[in-house]
């Protein structure tokens, strides 16, 4: 069966919409949560905010979130999204994250999205901070140079998996079914069983031809 996946959101979230989406996937910012934002869209938008707009707080909490929740990311989709980015800094960030998460073999392909020299997270002062405090061990040996202490790592800045599963339907379904398009489809159907195939494909960034393959005519639960 031939099919294609609609992996790319129309526009990356930014501003207040991004903040509410980040809260919606379990990050501690002062904003109301967006209901069930797409995980990969939100993670990519957060990395753009951090790397292109130098928002170190977003980047710090994003890294903490990855340390807690990486197992439930659809890495196939994230890899494709990152590969579509023209920003070398965004690609380098995800290459660094994949290097850190290399015990999960799904991240191997993501690490290949950046093949350039090591970049500095900070615009200035990297060498000084490295001499003073050393390197953040999460980034050691990866494509991004980050001095220790620049990106704080506080587990209290993100919800636990149990807490996030209570408020995010797709995350909960991914825990049950695995981090896949199929889990996201079922999460959408949990919210609205009347969705047409076209609507379901659009909501989950999945082309119509994949629906029968993943769900099946009698695969209802």
Describe the role of every protein-language-model region.
Residues 196-203:
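A short acidic, leucine-rich amphipathic alpha-helix
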Residues 186-187:
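Hydrophobic residues on short alpha-helical segments
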Residues 160-175:
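Short, Lys/Arg-enriched N-terminal segment that forms or immediately precedes the first helix
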Residues 127-159:
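Eukaryotic acidic, serine/proline-rich intrinsically disordered low-complexity regions
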Residues 205-219:
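Short amphipathic alpha-helical interaction segments
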Residues 191-196, 221:
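Secondary-structure boundary elements
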Residues 1-132:
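N-terminal, charged low-complexity regulatory/assembly segments
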Residues 175-183, 194:
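Short helix-coil-helix linker/hinge
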């Amino acid at each position: 069966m031939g099919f294609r996946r609609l992996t790319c959101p129309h526009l990356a979230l930014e501003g207040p919409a991004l903040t509410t989406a980040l809260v919606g996937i379990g990050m501690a910012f002062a904003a109301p949560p967006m209901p069930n934002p797409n995980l990969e869209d939100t993670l990519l938008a957060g990395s753009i905010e951090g790397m292109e707009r130098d928002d170190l707080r977003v980047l710090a909490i994003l890294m903490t979130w990855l340390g807690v929740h990486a197992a439930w990311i659809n890495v196939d989709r994230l890899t494709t999204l990152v590969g579509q980015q023209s920003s070398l800094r965004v690609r380098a960030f995800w290459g660094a994250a994949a290097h850190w998460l290399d015990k999960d073999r799904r991240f191997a392909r993501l690490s290949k999205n950046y093949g350039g020299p090591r970049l500095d997270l900070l615009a200035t002062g990297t060498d000084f901070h490295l001499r003073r405090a050393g390197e953040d061990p999460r980034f050691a040996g990866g494509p991004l140079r980050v001095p220790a202490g620049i990106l704080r790592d506080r587990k209290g800045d993100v919800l636990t998996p149990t807490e996030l599963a209570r408020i995010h339907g797709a995350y909960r379904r991914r825990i049950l079914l695995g981090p896949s398009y199929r889990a996201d489809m079922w999460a959408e159907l949990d919210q609205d069983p009347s969705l047409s195939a076209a609507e379901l494909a659009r909501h989950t960034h999945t082309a119509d031809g994949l629906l029968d393959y993943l769900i099946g005519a009698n695969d209802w639960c």
